[in-house]
Curated annotation (Swiss-Prot):
Residues 2-216 form the Glutamine amidotransferase type-2 domain. One of its GO terms (biological process) is protein N-linked glycosylation. It is found in: Cytoplasm. PROSITE patterns: GATASE_TYPE_2, SIS. Residues 282-421, 453-591 form the SIS domain. NCBIfam families: glmS, PRK00331.1. SUPFAM superfamilies: N-terminal nucleophile aminohydrolases (Ntn hydrolases), SIS domain. This is Glutamine--fructose-6-phosphate aminotransferase [isomerizing]. It catalyses: D-fructose 6-phosphate + L-glutamine = D-glucosamine 6-phosphate + L-glutamate. Its EC number is 2.6.1.16. It comes from Listeria monocytogenes serotype 4b (strain F2365). Catalyzes the first step in hexosamine metabolism, converting fructose-6P into glucosamine-6P using glutamine as a nitrogen source. One of its GO terms (molecular function) is carbohydrate derivative binding. InterPro entries: GATase_2_dom, GFAT, GFAT_N, GlmS/AgaS_SIS, GlmS/FrlB_SIS, Ntn_hydrolases_N, SIS_dom, SIS_dom_sf.
Length: 601
């Protein structure tokens, strides 16, 4: 949610900022803006809408060797010109962009800025006005630090001082921000992908630190003034990794990448003997626990439900799955030695991060499954396992979901082998995941079938239901989330046995009902539920695995191991959502009101 790019150097910052903001579009935004500093002149251009709209408003001769840019996802105030960033202080001396939420901004307004008039409804403008207030008696750095010391909440900030053309200021707390190192320039960004074209060498900024940046270097300090030395790291991404190539949308590209990602996970977790292997320290830590708590949001939560099924079957350890945003309100009764697994694509999800902080304070051990090495949850957890999915740009997660389940399967089977579980010992997981990858390839090669189904069932529908039992129920929930995210159809995933307990009242003539069937044990049960809704006028569609497919089923899913069926059955559901969105002329990669990385609570 929201994105920041800052530049200080010898070149014109304009194109660097605009291109950087384009790379951050996937994070979600409703307005954007840049500020360019040329000597003591600061030019601010901002507007509601897309980066392309902003770029058309920037004068062709706009110039500045220092600049800051921002994409805003509204939290305080409507998405409009006034609330778009950058924001300026009353005199125009200070110009600032900010990600995050300041919880006490109204109190600060009342205490320090009673007589100030404000242009916007944002919490951000309060910060920049405070800095100017304190700068009447303090240096810019000290005024910045004093303002920061008063803030309660999350922030990533980049600041320009009109009277100092040689310096850029930045700070962070609970919101991602990093420094990119260059020759005769330096950059600030909320995500390395924004500035990969400029540099691949980065330094993390930690919570409650500020950085004073010039074109020649930077100084990191705590708010108390202690200087910090921190080594840089080289990003493992390449600028080409975040391009669409020949694809019309990132989402379609990422759906097609899932077979390759699955094979990459096999390679990443295979030992020299060709066996799937997890770090022994992680296995020992988990097996010494008496209960596992999986904490996640959205798609990651759905992957966690599958993970619970796998781990309990293989490792014989009870598992609970929690929604991150609800977890902190009512902590579960803790066993003697619980372990917490956090699943997060970005490694920056604010709700999950707050949960991690809470359980660490209680002294419990933690493991993060993330796609981003070096991310906040990766750094702060005791252990990490990586997804190896590569950058996922589309807001609707596809390859990260299947990567999460694949890595959870790797973990579950490895744990099962450690305790001598017969099923874990009998499964050749590398081979079975290879079969999954082949099945995925077959399905992504059958796009025209799914496209036709999407047009027939969903092009004009206002709602849709997905049914499943057992492990298929978890995929039904994910299928519904994908559809509602990008097509704006009110979709829900249900345990089909619950239909008669309320949901069937919503069925009327033409209601689309899609059933997932991959398990022999529940085949006829769910087909009975399909017949029940069919009798009440529903328009039914069955996606079934080869071993349970019947004449009349609309799509046959290639056979995979029974424990790994979600990896296969989700593929046609992802494609269904994609083509439904196209039929409805929706923005597939950037659906309204959504953000890829949810960095505020």
């Amino acid at each position: 949610m929201c994105g920041i790019v800052g530049y200080i150097g010898t070149n014109n910052a304009k194109s660097i900022l605009l291109e950087g903001l384009e790379k951050l579009e996937y994070r979600g935004y409703d307005s954007a803006g840049i500020a360019l500093q040329n000597k003591d002149l600061v030019t601010v251009v901002k507007e509601k809408g897309r980066i392309a709209d902003l770029a058309s408003l920037v004068p062709s001769d706009a110039f500045g060797t220092t600049g800051i840019g921002h994409t805003r996802w509204a939290t305080h105030g409507k998405p409009n010109h006034e609330n778009a960033h950058p924001h300026q202080s009353k005199s125009g001396r200070f110009t600032m962009v900010h990600n995050g939420v300041i919880e006490n901004y109204t109190l600060l307004k009342e205490e320090y800025l009673k007589n100030h008039s404000f242009v916007s409804d944002t919490d951000t403008e309060v910060i920049v006005q405070l800095i100017e207030l304190f700068a009447a008696e303090l240096s810019t750095k000290e005024a910045f630090k004093k303002a920061l010391s008063l803030l309660h909440g999350s922030y990533a900030i980049c600041l320009i001082d009109q009277t100092d053309t040689e310096t850029l200021y930045a700070a962070k707390n609970k919101s991602p921000l990093l420094i990119g190192k260059g020759e005769n320039f330096n950059v600030i960004a909320s995500d390395a992908m924004a500035v990969l074209k400029e540099t691949d060498e980065f330094v993390e900024i930690m919570d409650k630190e500020i950085v004073i940046v010039t074109k020649d270097g930077f100084t990191l300090e705590t708010l108390e003034g202690e200087e910090i030395s921190r080594a840089s790291y080289t990003a493992e991404l390449d600028a080409s990794d975040i391009e669409k190539g020949t694809y019309p949308h990132y989402m379609l590209k990422e759906i097609d990448e899932q077979p390759a990602v699955t094979r990459k996970i096999i390679q990443a977790y295979q030992n020299e003997a060709g066996e799937i292997n997890v770090d022994q320290t992680i296995l020992d830590e988990i097996l010494s626990s008496d209960r596992i708590h999986i904490v996640a949001c959205g798609t990651s939560y759905h992957a966690g439900l599958v993970g619970k099924n796998l781990i309990e079957k293989m490792a014989k350890i009870p598992v609970e799955v929690h929604v991150s945003s609800e977890f902190g309100y009512n902590l579960p009764l803790m066993s003697k030695k619980p372990l917490f697994i956090f699943i997060t694509q970005s490694g920056e999800t604010a709700d999950s991060r707050q949960c991690l902080v809470k359980v660490k304070e209680l002294g419990y051990r933690t493991l993060t499954l993330t796609n981003v090495p070096g991310s906040t949850l990766d750094r702060e957890a005791d252990h990490s396992m990586y997804l190896y999915a590569g950058p996922e740009i589309a807001v609707a997660s596809t390859k990260a979901y299947t990567a999460q389940i694949s890595v959870l399967a790797v973990l579950a089977v490895s744990l099962g082998r450690e305790i001598g579980d017969a099923e874990a010992l009998s499964i050749n997981l590398a081979a079975e995941l290879g079969i999954v990858a082949t099945a995925m390839e077959a399905m992504v090669s059958s796009k025209e079938v799914i496209e036709h189904i999407a047009g027939e069932y969903l092009a004009t529908s206002r709602n849709a239901f997905f049914l499943g039992r057992n492990i298929d129920y978890f995929v039904a929930m994910e299928a519904a989330l994908k559809l509602k995210e990008i097509s704006y159809i009110q979709a829900e995933g249900f345990a089909s046995g619950e239909l008669k307990h309320g949901t069937i009242a919503l069925i009327e003539d033409g209601t689309p009902v899609l059933a997932l069937i991959t398990q022999e044990s529940i085949n006829w049960n769910i087909r009975g539920n399909v017949n029940e809704v069919l009798a009440r006028g529903a328009k039914t569609c069955v996606f079934a695995m080869e071993n349970v497919a019947q004449p009349g089923d609309r799509f046959v899913i290639p056979q995979v191991h029974p424990l790994l069926t979600p990896l296969a059955s989700v593929i046609p559901c992802q494609l269904l959502a994609y083509y439904a969105a196209l039929h409805r002329d929706c923005d597939v990669d950037k659906p309204r009101n959504l953000a890829k990385s949810v960095t505020v609570e």
